């Protein structure tokens, strides 16, 4: 039987002229035949979902250690929430929803066990060998470390998806090739030698909405988890005018609401107001820029998908509250110190005796290597661990493992 591609619904949405177009994609590093039933960006999104790295997000920390409770968010639940917000923004702005969703789904692949604590610890032990950067690690995963296909390593994503992964937070280089946030990680520079991701320009608007969706999701849901854990209280939220206004609005409409429902009503309003703010700002900036293609978005002198000045101030206030009340809470700091010790101990143990990694693939690849490449392989192995696996690996090798509860 044959497929009538003219009758298919995919790829027929009303995209804006400045949206990324899968039919004119800059292609993949390893050329492949197209699909008669899916656009290239759909295929990217599907490949991302089927990776081992995606499944591992289930047991990687967002803020609270993955063993803390069934209802706290992990990297996977956070990623799904980011993808939902990114897709909503993409639809409102007439962008390619599949590309926006794909960038959102892949953006946290490079995160280590134990969240930013694990990343900081791994960066510290890898400093003599080039350090560690989760964004560069995400690129390594999708271009090298995932091994599923017969003809290439990685998952061979399109240029647009990789560009979005690497540049979703903005250009990495100035026009004069100076790093915008310090030196560009070597894995990114190495890949650009093969497939230039144009590090001095902005990413597509699809990637930009994925980035702002990440901010919206983690601010909102860290508040939710903070209230659930007891590290935050409603009185603390009242200190931020934006949140105080939302709470007053909910109380006026539902004066006797139970706390769990009250929390949800605040969170849903926070997400809605932030999404609407981004849409309004993007529409205003698009009307001024008047882009005629996705290339005009990349060449713009500022980000298009952003918060207004007032909402950006609210975003900063929320981040400051979360940092003070949760991230720097003594209980969380104790847990973070223990998590860092686990990563540091495992790195030292595997460098001293790679056979302790209990993986034939990694042991075979490390045998006979000098310290620098060996350290990178050990770093890859550690970065891929889930929280629970890292804890169990430490218990197997050491008499005392820090209590992360």
Swiss-Prot record:
InterPro entries recorded for this chain?
dGTPase, dGTPase-like, dNTPase_2, HD/PDEase_dom, HD_domain, PHydrolase_assoc_dom
Residue spans crossing the bilayer? none
Which domain of life does the protein's organism represent? Answer: Bacteria
Q: What is this protein called?
A: Deoxyguanosinetriphosphate triphosphohydrolase-like protein
Q: Which SUPFAM superfamilies match?
A: HD-domain/PDEase-like
Record GO biological process? dGTP catabolic process
Xref: Pfam families: HD, HD_assoc
Gene Ontology terms for molecular function? dGTPase activity
Which organism does this record belong to? Rhizobium leguminosarum bv. trifolii (strain WSM2304)
Give the record's family classification: Belongs to the dGTPase family. Type 2 subfamily.
């Amino acid at each position: 039987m044959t497929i009538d591609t003219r009758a298919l619904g995919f790829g027929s949405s009303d995209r804006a002229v400045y949206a990324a177009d899968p039919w004119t994609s800059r292609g993949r590093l390893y050329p492949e035949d197209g699909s008669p039933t899916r656009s290239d960006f759909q295929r990217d999104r599907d490949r991302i979902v089927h990776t081992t790295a995606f499944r591992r997000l289930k047991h990687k920390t967002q803020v609270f250690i993955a063993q803390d409770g069934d209802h706290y968010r992990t990297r996977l639940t956070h990623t799904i929430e980011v993808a939902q917000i990114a897709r909503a923004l993409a639809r409102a702005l007439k962008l390619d929803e599949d590309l926006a969703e794909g960038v959102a789904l892949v953006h946290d692949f490079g995160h280590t066990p134990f969240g930013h604590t694990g990343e900081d610890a791994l960066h510290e032990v890898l400093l003599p060998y080039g350090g560690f950067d989760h964004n560069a690690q995400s690129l390594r995963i999708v271009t090298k470390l995932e091994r599923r296909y017969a003809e290439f390593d990685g998952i061979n994503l399109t240029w647009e998806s990789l560009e979005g992964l690497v540049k979703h937070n903005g250009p990495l280089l100035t026009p004069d090739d100076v790093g915008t946030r310090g030196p560009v990680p070597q894995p990114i520079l190495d890949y650009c030698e093969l497939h230039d991701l144009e590090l001095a320009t902005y990413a597509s608007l699809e990637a930009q909405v994925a980035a702002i969706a990440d901010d919206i999701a983690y601010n909102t849901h860290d508040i939710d988890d903070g209230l659930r854990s007891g590290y935050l209280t409603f009185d603390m939220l009242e200190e931020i005018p934006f949140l105080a206004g939302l709470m007053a609005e909910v109380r006026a409409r539902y004066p006797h609401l139970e706390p769990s429902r009250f929390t949800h009503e605040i969170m849903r309003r926070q997400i809605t107001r932030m999404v609407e703010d981004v849409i309004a700002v993007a529409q205003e900036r698009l009307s001024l820029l008047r882009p005629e293609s996705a290339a005009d978005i990349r060449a713009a002198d500022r980000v298009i998908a952003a918060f207004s000045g007032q909402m950006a101030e609210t975003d900063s206030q929320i981040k400051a509250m979360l940092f003070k009340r949760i991230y720097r809470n003594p209980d969380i700091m104790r847990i973070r110190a223990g998590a860092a010790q686990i990563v540091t101990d495992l790195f030292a143990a595997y460098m001293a005796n790679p056979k302790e990694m209990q993986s034939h693939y990694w042991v075979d690849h490390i045998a006979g290597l000098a310290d620098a490449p060996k350290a990178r392989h050990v770093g890859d192995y550690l970065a891929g661990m889930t929280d629970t696996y890292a804890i169990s690996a430490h218990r197997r090798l050491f008499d005392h493992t820090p209590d992360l509860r």
